[in-house]
Amino acid sequence: MNMGSVAGAVLKMLLLLSTQNWNRVEAGNSYDCDEPLVSALPQASFSSSSELSSSHGPGFARLNRRDGAGGWSPLVSNKYQWLQIDLGERMEVTSVATQGGYGSSNWVTSYLLMFSDSGRNWKQYRQEDSIWGFSGNANADSVVYYRLQPSIKARFLRFIPLEWNPKGRIGMRIEVFGCAYRSVVIDLDGKSSLLYRFDQNSLSPIRDIISLKFKTMESDGILLHRAGPAGDHITLELRRGKLFLLINSGDARLTSSSTLINLTLGSLLDDQHWHSVLIQRLGKQVNFTVDEHRRHFHAQGEFNYLDLDYEISFGGISAPAKSVSLPYKHFHGCLENLFYNGVDVIGLVKEHSPQIITMGNASFSCSQPQSMPLTFLSPRSYLVLPASTKEEAISASFQFRTWNKAGLLLFSELQLVSGSLLLLLSDGKLKLTLYQPGKSPSDITAGAGLGDGQWHSVSLSAKRNHLSVVVDGHISPASPWLGPEQVNSGGVFYFGGCPDKGFGSKCKSPLGGFQGCMRLISINNKMVDLIAVQQGALGNFSDLQIDSCGISDRCLPNSCEHGGECSQSWSTFHCNCTNTGYTGATCHSSVYEQSCEAYKHQGNASGFYYIDSDGSGPLQPFLLYCNMTETAWTVMQHNGSDLMRVRNTHSENAHTGVFEYTASMEQLQAAINRAEHCQQELVYYCKKSRLVNQQDGSPRSWWVGRTNETQTYWGGSLPVHQKCTCGLEGNCIDAQYHCNCDADLNEWTNDTGFLSYKEHLPVTKIVITDTGRPHSEAAYKLGPLLCRGDRPFWNAASFNTEASYLHFPTFHGELSADVSFFFKTTALSGVFLENLGITDFIRIELRSPTTVTFSFDVGNGPFELSVHSPTHFNDNQWHHVRVERNMKEASLRVDELPPKIQAAPTDGHVLLQLNSQLFVGGTATRQRGFLGCIRSLQLNGMALDLEERATVTPGVQPGCRGHCGSYGKLCRHGGKCREKPSGFFCDCSSSAYAGPFCSKEISAYFGSGSSVIYNFQENYSLSKNSSFHAASFHGDMKLSREMIKFSFRTTRAPSLLLHMSSFYKEYLSIIIAKNGSLQIRYKLNKYHEPDVISFDLKSMADGQLHHIKINREEGMVFVEIDENTRRQTYLSSGTEFSAVKSLVLGRMLEYSDVDQETALAAAHGFTGCLSAVQFSHIAPLKAALQPGPPAPVTVTGHVTESSCVAPSGTDATSRERTHSFADHSGTMDDREPLTHAIKSDSAVIGGLIAVVIFILLCVSAIAVRIYQQKRLYKRNEAKRSENVDSAEAVLKSELHIQNAVGENQKEYFF
């Protein structure tokens, strides 16, 4: 086992234990923190926005009490009412309970819970970090409890009713539960700091645990800093409301990614509320926690030790000379419960410990914020404030923060100077527009990126002849001229939005209302009293939350998966999935398939593809090659594909070859796990180089796989045998050994084969130690990792009864979930899948023959999405279903039908909480079960093994046949779909095409004088298994119909394309006449002249590719040329062929019984390219060129497999001759076709003779060279040549590695 991994595991365990212990310390008695806190409070601790009567006052709002009218009720029931509790001091609140008014119809059905330390600047408690409201009561007497996770630490609580019984009014009785909370605080004013010096023996240099809570008045500041003499440091800094943890080992000016930790957590931390921080460092492991968000970091390189001074500063950098020279700002705010490695730092300050130095002013009570924020909750929110009309100028200022890039900030009408002022947020910029009658609007634009969630200050003023706006202290560059008139306000300022037009307002908001927070609102240099606004004594408002800023960061945590970029507005977030390889609202779903098998069954050809083996899982997609044969092979390459020769090694000076793959080991493992079979060829040559030490059995050479374990079995063997191929087969050179190399011969031998034990693949390393003796040498070459099949893709189960189902563990897809599968059925309906929780659930079902439905509930009430099809789903064909649910939306996709999408409710429940087993093919009630097949069921990218579970489940069978019904359409050009136990294949035996889908065109270049002859009488005798002479069955070989298809390209005329003959001098010839026209000549009666079908529209010998299709049904012939010329003709010479003899492509050797035009074309033959020749069920060209069962075909002359496709503008014949495929076969006929040859053939024959002589000379030269090299090797065997090429030539000549000639191979020397 790797010692580094052991150490890492130990460090993680220690870090986990320290986390648990510290959490217990920090929580105090949280496990016993459920005491009622309200029942014993005095009446003065209760307050409210209003009360219906003195007997409905807030003091009567205690749970289960009947005092007064039996609870609190406000004067008016609206959403601006509240009930407030003062707990007397900060307490930890762990749960709340509500009840309606006793004996009444008054109860609250939903409410908000707010909390505060001072009774000002309230913060809303949110469930699941996004739920705004709590569900309340359904009657007056029942009690509804809510456990608060996390708990609240606060003095004041405020209940704000949102909805209530529509037949009654607001009525509440409440109780809160919790316990006392230990709070030790210190307030730093932005100029002060603490310096803590400690005993060097009390600390470990590799371990730090720091915990604290803070509440800040500013968005920037140093919370803690510890540095060392060499530049090592730990710094926790607040920047723009986010916390940055910086840990550096070494000179900060020479930082590198291996030594610098820069972790960022939190957002909007400058909200003047408490936030908790926990930092844990143990060696290279770092945990950083802010509130409920945690990040873990594992440092690389030498990071275990930090050289730090024995002092740490809080609130600033107390010794700047020792720190990094970076600009910094002191912390302004309050620290609470500050512990450094278990030491109460604030307690030491209170005790005036000499270990603590306080610089500046510090106090032990927290100063409270003076500003009062307000929240514009919706686009309909607005605040209307009065302004004096007697002022000679207009001025207004405020601060705002928002995520929106557009919205109305301020509107005001002008007096005297008619017109209006409009202050907008537009595209993140501030735009001030002055409207005056008869004039074009005047604009001032200021600021940029103002929708970033930060506080921004705005000040505008309008005087007699000047208009200006200041944003964050920057004055606008230009101001429009107002004129000499005095400027007065119209008496009203509209902030954030406009009332409805029915109120008579002239306010306008072209970009919609503002959603965000404002504070420090000032009009004409007078601060607005928002308490008076809240009490209704000043101005007017709608849909505001006063004394609270309700902004939240919807991108924390980032719900965009797989590296998607998160952006947000006030009410939602958006994910940019560009260049991630994923799609969907949260970048959850991969755009790539999970295997080559999946690509193949979409009809794709061989090529490079991205695959994503775990689908929506964490692994990224990677590029590989898919070789689409009858089976889809996945080819994964590495960097060591060259032959490597090794010399001069021994046990202390071993050669180690390391292989790096184009994918990570995790990605490779996922691909291997999906595959049915994987293999990797390891070619190993040896000469006096042993694999095993025969004395003690220890290995002399070995390889390592992804398990990082030493493997001593070799290609063709398995781990249980620890042998080579020859050892398994019993044919090793020396029978006493299990490998050829162990014979230790002074000549080259090999132990080569395929490694196929999936759990050990791929090979990552090979080690060789036994090439140190004289004449000792080894060579190896590792092939790519090859995998075939996709087990989950075909993993299926057949459900035979409605009461049967498969059950699996609970599906965990709390925030993001996807389910995909194939189904086929003839049933009318049935449930595919169901998983239940207490109230939450998911269900996917066939609702009707044309409807698939996805139902779910995550706490916001049940939703249904249905996809309707114009055709039936119960057609016994495979249909693909994909369901996804995330924080943004839910979607249902079936086949290629339009998807159904349901947006998630804003600020609704987001956690899918399930606890039952997952039922597949049925339900827990055993009703509405599915009848049919389910295949390739995957949940969040993880496949469920349906077949394994089906083998032990009554009413369910593993597997499902009948794939051709759905995938048979992939078999093209007459290929037949054939079933396999897992999948299907295309039988191309009767097609002129080849390949996995019968789509690979079989083409050939015909040289001058060449031909392919298919003999029907031999085929007949083979098929009938008869030995009679052909004449005995001439009468049986009759054709009343045939179908002929082929393509050709040539520049020669005349030419013979195809000729079919019979023993009775009947024939069909397809020729290009001397004038370039295409002629089809049928002679079905030897006593009649042939019927000629001629196409002389243009020359067909034009070097272009032409397609011919001929169908004959007795005397009727239909001809199609190039898919645009069609003709139908009736023959006069007969209706059938009698005693069919042969079919010829190219030149005919005998043509005495044909007409003159055919004879002329036959003498010239065909020079060019023929492709995809099909004669009924016979493919003569394919039979000649492709390996397969014996066929009655004869090839003469130069016929080579080629391609008929050529770039436009090139000479067709010359293009064809550039192909260098070896001549292919059938039965080669070496007879010289000279009987009726024309004079031009002599040149061809001469050329062929010259080529043969040249080949013989080359073979002789090679033989002489090999003989010379053998002699040279024997003379210099004791001396190792330094020349790589000559050394490899020796190895190749001895091993006859002809296929390796010309490869860029390597040689390794020690």
From Swiss-Prot:
Tissues where this protein is expressed: Specifically present in developing cortical interneurons: highly expressed in cortical parvalbumin (PV) cells and midbrain dopaminergic neurons and is localized presynaptically (at protein level). Also present in the substantia nigra pars compacta (SnC) and ventral tegmental area (VTA) midbrain dopaminergic projection populations.
Matches recorded under PROSITE patterns: EGF_3, FA58C_1, FA58C_2, FA58C_3, FIBRINOGEN_C_2, LAM_G_DOMAIN
SUPFAM superfamilies cross-referenced by the UniProt entry: Concanavalin A-like lectins/glucanases, EGF/Laminin, Fibrinogen C-terminal domain-like, Galactose-binding domain-like
EGF-like domain ranges (all copies): 551-588, 960-999
Domain F5/8 type C: residue ranges: 33-179
Entries under SMART domains matching the protein: EGF, FA58C, LamG
Signal peptide: 1-27
Disruption phenotype: Synaptic defects characterized by increased dopamine but decreased GABA signaling. A reduction in the output of cortical parvalbumin (PV)-positive GABAergic basket cells is observed, together with an increase of midbrain dopaminergic release in the nucleus accumbens. Increased dopaminergic signaling induces behavior abnormalities, characterized by severe and highly penetrant over-grooming behavior, resulting in whisker, face and sometimes body hair loss but rarely lesions. The over-grooming phenotype can be pharmacologically reversed following administration of haloperidol drug.
Subcellular location: Presynaptic cell membrane
Keywords: Cell adhesion, Cell membrane, Cell projection, Disulfide bond, EGF-like domain, Glycoprotein, Membrane, Repeat, Signal, Synapse, Transmembrane, Transmembrane helix
Domain of life: Eukaryota
Function recorded in the entry: Presynaptic protein involved in both dopaminergic synaptic transmission and GABAergic system, thereby participating in the structural maturation of inhibitory interneuron synapses. Involved in the dopaminergic synaptic transmission by attenuating dopamine release through a presynaptic mechanism. Also participates in the GABAergic system.
Family per record: Belongs to the neurexin family.
Protein name (database record): Contactin-associated protein-like 4
